[in-house]
Amino acid sequence: LVLREDFESQTFPPSGWVVKGTELSEDLESGYAHWSLNWNEVTGCSIAGSGCAEVMSDFKEGQAGISKEEWLITPAVQVADNASLSFTFWCNASSFMTNKYGSFLVKVSTDDGDTWSDLWNAASQEDIENSGLTWPWNKDAMGIENNWQKLTPNVSLEAYVGKTVKIAFYFR
């Protein structure tokens, strides 16, 4: 195990992690904003414990063309033989995929975050199936009552063995 983070600390982001994002105008960021998209430590998550990192897009009509990026970046880690990345998250996949409200990707950098390559894309059938999840992303295919589903993809890091990498959880 190279890195484990459960987001249970009162400090967010955790030591060594980086949060960055696009700031919108004050009228869109606060109060009656049409978009709410930030990484925050929240309580009441049902993954495990009381803390989690959350990124949420609250899409409403009338704000076409808004582009906001949010990043949660791990500290640099050395990738060992047979390493894989496993993370658990909740996703309203039916709404997310059907309405194209956003993009959720996991990215990797081998140059301390100067450049990023896609490692896993929530909109890619190949990435989803290769990580052990079910495609298509909708409540009927997933056999769930509501649209929220707890997911734990497993992504190979074989291409990065012996390298020092940073992993980014990216939402736009």
Task: Give the residues covered by each predicted segment.
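Extracellular glycan-recognition surfaces and repeat-rich motifs
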Residues: 1-68, 123-149
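Extracellular beta-strand-rich recognition modules
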Residues: 7, 28, 72-95, 104, ...
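Asp-box/BNR beta-propeller loop motif
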Residues: 10-14, 109-119
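Short, solvent-exposed loop/turn and secondary-structure capping segments
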Residues: 18-20, 97-103, 118-121
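Short consensus segments that form the blades of beta-propeller domains
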Residues: 63-65, 95-100
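Short beta-strands within extracellular/lumenal beta-sheet-rich domains
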Residues: 63-82, 147-153
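Short, surface-exposed tryptophan/glycine-enriched loops
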Residues: 79, 136-166
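Membrane-topology and secretion signals of cell-surface/extracellular proteins
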Residues: 90, 96-99, 113-116, 125-130, ...
